[in-house]
Amino acid sequence: MAGTPNFDRRSFLRLAAAAGLTGMAGVTSATPGRSPGPKKDEILVGVTSTADSPRKAVADAVPGNAEIVHENETLSYAAVKFPSKAPKQARENFISAITKRDEVKYAEKNATHEALYTANDPKYGSQYAPQQVNADSAWDTTLGSSSVKIAVVDQGVKYDHPDLSSQFGSNKGRDFVDNDGDPYPDLLSDEYHGTHVAGIAAGTTDNNEGIGGISNSTLLSGRALSESGSGSTSDIADAIEWAADQGADVINLSLGGGGYSSTMKNAVSYATQQGSLVVAAAGNDGRQSVSYPAAYSECVAVSALDPDETLASYSNYGSEIDLAAPGTNVLSCWTTSTEYNEISGTSMATPVVSGVAGLALAVHNLSPADLRNHLKNTAVDIGLSSTKQGSGRVDAANAVTTDPGDGGGGGGGGSKETTYDGTLSSSSDSNCVSHSWNYSSPSQVVIDLSGPSSADFDLYATEGSGTCPTTRSYDYRSWSYDSTEQIVIDNPDTSADLGILVDSYSGSGSYTVTITEKE
């Protein structure tokens, strides 16, 4: 965010490397009959904000046997579909040709995603996740607030479940798989993941029914995965954009894996700019590699713990991890007659963090960046390395009872802001800034870029080397479809000046870089 957006405390799934909506702001209609679920024959083309529209920007480059089947004007991309029998080289040739255009920022395959995995509630005694994060102590202060919205981008949610029905308002959500206004699961026997996730985050607590969720927040369901547990990058990105536009304070992404996607990056960047905290699962491969989208700097990356607070054997880990939470054998809502079930995964740890975020927002009015910092500052060190626990195990009681101005356990809570103004005269023009640190050991630095809406400026940073980044050599990068960018660095290396590059991908004009160091 270039500057904190105005707001009023509004209120995993595995990615395979294979890689519509109507009547919503910024999204034009998809081609009628576009198949739901995986879209392996599609290429997503991202364009600059200066293009008339994504469709117009790429139309004359589309081969005769292909067609534009979808566009999202807010995220500035179009989906181009090739015949299923078209040779792989045809798609590769298209990507090579289209990315040479000045108005095109990227072209990538439309990836396929697959699902991974003292209150009076009768089953509360069979739970351990709320107790492990001290939710019961937090509930002495607040059970949560209906003014806080948590969006679950996942499979559909069984919103008439007895532990979920009161958490949904008149707007239940939207189905991005079938392209309609009802996010209810198509096949209850197979489509349980979203319901389980929703129950962990915000199943109704203290209602003499079933389990206790972490926070009594309002739920929104963005159905972007079908009953088969798979979905496309475009459907998930559109659902993230929609959730942000609906005023979601927290967007839960119990999905991820695979590689970097510019379309998904733009979606989580947009959501953050709109005032949403995006919480994502680290991945279930049991290796040192945090999956996307959790690895994006905008997302809170969550690893999974066993009941004894050791890292779960399946949980991914790495330097991008922000927080850890219980994820093994977590009891929550189910879609069949049993109504409740235990499953494991970073998918289950993620909504624990989302629920704690909901509790914190019921008490504290925080921006996404400040909420993220607050959750990390109030986390409990459980003795794991930072690559496994991040700042620690999320703690609901600390998040609710600690004044954000106190900085929790992570410093004095103060901050210092420095601004740098500049002008870029044309495309490919760039300026470098060398920033001297105000604090010797800040807990976090946030770099915001605000530039002209008619241009497309990108932001790069290096730490610990004292060198200026380039568009090819950098430690951090934020590049979306406009000139509003943000980089967040936790516990930055202050042994040398911070290097910052502002680069014009297209257009010209004045900009401001704001650097906020937090104690």
Curated annotation (Swiss-Prot):
Instruction: Give the active-site positions.
Output: D154 (charge relay system), H193 (charge relay system), S347 (charge relay system)
E.C. designation(s): 3.4.21.-
Q: Which GO terms describe its biological process?
A: proteolysis
Q: Where is this region: Disordered?
A: 386-425
Do you know which Pfam families this protein is assigned to? Peptidase_S8, PPC
Gly residues bias located where? 405-415
Q: Does the keyword Secreted apply?
A: yes
Please verify whether the record's keywords include Secreted: yes
Name the PROSITE patterns on file. SUBTILASE, SUBTILASE_HIS, SUBTILASE_SER, TAT
Q: Which residues, if any, are the signal sequence?
A: 1-27
PTM per UniProt? Predicted to be exported by the Tat system. The position of the signal peptide cleavage has not been experimentally proven.
Sequence ranges assigned to domain Peptidase S8 in this UniProt record: 127-400
Task: State the Gene Ontology terms under molecular function.
Answer: serine-type endopeptidase activity
Its main subcellular localisation, reduced to a broad class, is secreted
Q: Which UniProt keywords apply?
A: Hydrolase, Protease, Secreted, Serine protease, Signal, Zymogen
Q: Where in the cell is it found?
A: Secreted
Gene3D superfamilies, A to Z: 2.60.120.380, Peptidase S8/S53 domain
Query: An example Gene Ontology cellular component term from the record?
Result: extracellular region
Q: Which residues form the propeptide?
A: 28-116
Q: InterPro entries, per this entry?
A: Peptidase_C_arc/bac, Peptidase_S8/S53_dom, Peptidase_S8/S53_dom_sf, Peptidase_S8_His-AS, Peptidase_S8_Ser-AS, Peptidase_S8_subtilisin-like, Peptidase_S8_subtilisin-rel, TAT_signal
**Role of this protein:** Probable secreted halophilic serine protease showing proteolytic activity toward the protease general substrate azocasein.
Q: Which family does it belong to?
A: Belongs to the peptidase S8 family.
- In its UniProt entry, what is this protein called? Halolysin
Q: Source gene?
A: hly
